[in-house]
Every structure is written in structure tokens, then in C-alpha cells.
Amino acid sequence: MEIFNQIYILCSGLISGVIIFQSLIVASSIFTVLPEENAGILLRNLFPKFFLFLIFLSSLSLTFSFLANLNFYPFGFIGILGLLSMSVCYFIIPKTNQARDEKDDSLFKKLHTLSVSLTLLVLFLNLAVIFLIS
């Protein structure tokens, strides 16, 4: 059971690290290095993979929370929230891109804000695991 516990913690750390790396380093660097047109093309390629990877890690996290026999609340709940939140982010990508292409700034801003908010929620919940598990 201890190995499952360690893998659960590792998954939470990976989720947090991937979000921080993608948000603070990759996305911000792309906008400073590439022209806006090319940055958009690259980000449209990266973000679906980013969300799919987080869905995968959240699924692992949820699985290992059960295998480690951790309390559903908060540990399994964090996995479910991660899985659902990142799925929403993934599935709104086409509408977000369409809003950007059609210059529907209001809809784009709402969808982008939803995506960022859900990603931050998942980040904070997974960072909290370190404090909750000890």
C-alpha cells in the first residue's frame, strides 16, 4: 500500500509541475519569442496535449488514491475534480479557438477565463496534497 501512496503523491507533484511549467515558462516564452500569428498556431497544438496529459495524470491520481486506500475526501475528490476540470478545458478548446477566429472577444474571454480558473483550481488542489497527506 505504501508504494501506491507514494505514486499518488508523485502524480500530484507531476500535475502541479506540468501546470506551472506550461503556464509560467512555455506559454509566456512563446508569446515573447514568436509573432502573435505563429504563437497562436503553436499554442493551438500544445494546449490539447497539455490537457490530455493532465487528464491522464488525474486518472492515475484517482486510481492510486483508491489503491492506497486513502480517504475519498479529500484525495479521491481531488482526482475527480482534476479529471472533470481538465476534461472541460479540453472540450472547450474548439469553441475557444472559434471565438478567437471570429473575433468574438466576449465569448473568448469567458471561455479562456474558465479554462485558466479550472487549471488554477487543479494546481492548488494538487499542491494542497502535500499538506493534507502528512
What are the roles of these predicted feature ranges?
Residues M1-S134:
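Polytopic transmembrane helical bundles with strong interfacial aromatic enrichment
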